[in-house]
C-alpha cells in the first residue's frame, strides 16, 4: 500500500511531467506550426504573402502545410532564394512531433512544390522555368509526382490532345528524377493538361501517367462522347474515364456509348453522371 507521502510524490511527478511537456511546445502543434510559418515567412525578402494550415492530430503532435506567394514576374534568381529558404525551413521544422505535409510557392497562376533537398528543388525550378516561359501554358501545379498544366482557348478534345502531346515534347528533357516514398526510382513524367472553368477549377482534363501510357482508347471515347452530348466535366486517363453530362437524361446513352468503346475496362473505371448528381 502506498503511503500518503508516496501518493503526493506520484501526483507531483505527474504534474511536473505535464509542465515539462507543455514547455516543449504548443499542445496544438499543427496549427501552432502553421501560425509560426506565416509569421516567419511574411517577414522574408521577395515574399508578399504566406498562408499556413495544420491539423492537431494528438496533443503536441500535428501535420502542418504552408504556401508563400511571390510576384508573378519574380526572377529566376529571386525564386531560387525563396525556394532555398523554404527548403531549409522544411528540413529544420519537420521533426518528431511535426509531420509537414507540403510546402509550396505560389507564382502567379502556378504552384511550385518545395522538397527537402536542394538538388531536387533546383531540378523542379528548372522544370518550372521551362513551363512558365512557354506560351502553351497559362497556369498549373508542378510537383514531383505530377505536372498539371492549364491551357487556354476554346475547349475541345483536339486541343487537349495536342497540348498533352506537346507537353511531352516540351518537357521530356526536364523531367526530374527522384526516389519515391517506397524507395523506388521515379520520374516527374505524369502530366495532366486541362481547361479550367470560370473561377479556376479544372473542367476538362487529360491525364497521362508516363510517356508510354498514352490513353488512346479513352481519348477516342471522349471524342465520340463530346460529339454526342453536351458535357459539363470530364477527366480521362488510361483505364479511367469520368464524365458528367449537362443533362441527366443523356446519362444512359452516354454510358452505353463509352462502355461500348472501352470494352474490357473494369466496372468502376467508367463513371458517367449528370452534372446535378
State what each model feature region is.
Residues 1-11:
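Bacterial N-terminal signal peptides that target proteins for export
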Residues 40, 78-90, 160-171, 218-226, ...:
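Short amphipathic alpha-helices in soluble, non-transmembrane regions
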Residues 191-277:
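Extracytoplasmic/luminal low-complexity segments enriched in Pro/Gly and acidic/polar residues
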Residues 63-65, 80, 90-181:
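Long, acidic/polar, low-complexity amphipathic helices and coiled-coil-like
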Residues 46-67, 140-144, 149, 186, ...:
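Short edge beta-strands and adjacent turn/loop segments
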Residues 33-111:
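N-terminal Sec/ER secretory leader and immediately downstream segment
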Residues 19-23:
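C-terminal motif of bacterial Sec signal peptides marking the signal peptidase cleavage site
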Residues 25-28:
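Bacterial signal peptide processing site
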Amino acid at each position: 500500500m502506498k503511503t500518503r507521502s508516496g501518493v503526493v510524490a506520484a501526483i507531483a511527478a505527474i504534474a511536473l511531467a505535464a509542465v515539462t511537456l507543455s514547455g516543449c511546445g504548443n499542445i496544438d502543434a499543427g496549427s501552432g506550426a502553421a501560425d509560426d510559418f506565416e509569421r516567419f515567412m511574411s517577414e522574408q525578402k521577395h515574399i508578399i504573402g504566406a498562408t499556413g494550415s495544420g491539423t492537431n492530430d494528438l496533443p503536441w503532435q500535428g501535420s502542418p502545410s504552408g504556401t508563400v506567394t511571390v510576384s508573378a514576374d519574380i526572377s529566376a534568381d529571386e525564386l531560387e532564394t525563396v525556394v532555398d529558404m523554404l527548403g531549409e525551413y522544411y528540413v529544420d521544422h519537420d521533426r518528431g512531433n511535426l509531420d509537414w505535409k507540403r510546402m509550396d510557392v505560389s507564382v502567379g497562376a502556378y504552384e511550385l512544390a518545395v522538397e527537402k533537398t536542394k538538388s531536387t528543388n533546383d531540378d523542379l525550378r528548372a522544370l518550372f522555368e521551362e513551363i512558365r516561359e512557354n506560351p502553351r501554358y497559362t497556369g498549373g501545379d508542378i510537383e514531383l509526382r505530377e505536372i498539371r498544366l492549364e491551357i487556354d482557348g476554346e475547349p475541345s478534345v483536339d486541343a487537349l490532345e495536342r497540348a498533352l502531346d506537346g507537353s511531352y515534347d516540351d518537357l521530356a528533357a526536364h523531367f526530374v528524377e527522384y526516389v519515391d516514398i517506397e524507395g523506388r526510382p521515379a520520374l516527374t513524367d505524369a502530366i495532366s493538361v486541362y481547361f479550367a472553368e470560370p473561377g479556376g477549377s479544372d473542367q476538362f482534363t487529360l491525364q497521362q501517367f508516363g510517356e508510354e501510357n498514352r490513353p488512346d482508347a479513352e481519348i477516342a471515347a471522349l471524342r465520340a462522347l463530346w460529339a454526342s452530348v453536351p458535357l459539363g466535366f470530364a477527366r480521362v486517363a488510361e483505364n479511367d474515364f469520368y464524365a458528367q453530362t449537362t443533362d441527366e437524361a443523356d446519362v444512359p446513352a452516354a454510358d452505353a456509348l463509352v462502355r461500348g468503346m472501352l470494352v474490357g475496362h473494369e466496372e468502376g473505371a467508367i463513371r458517367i453522371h449528370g452534372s446535378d448528381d
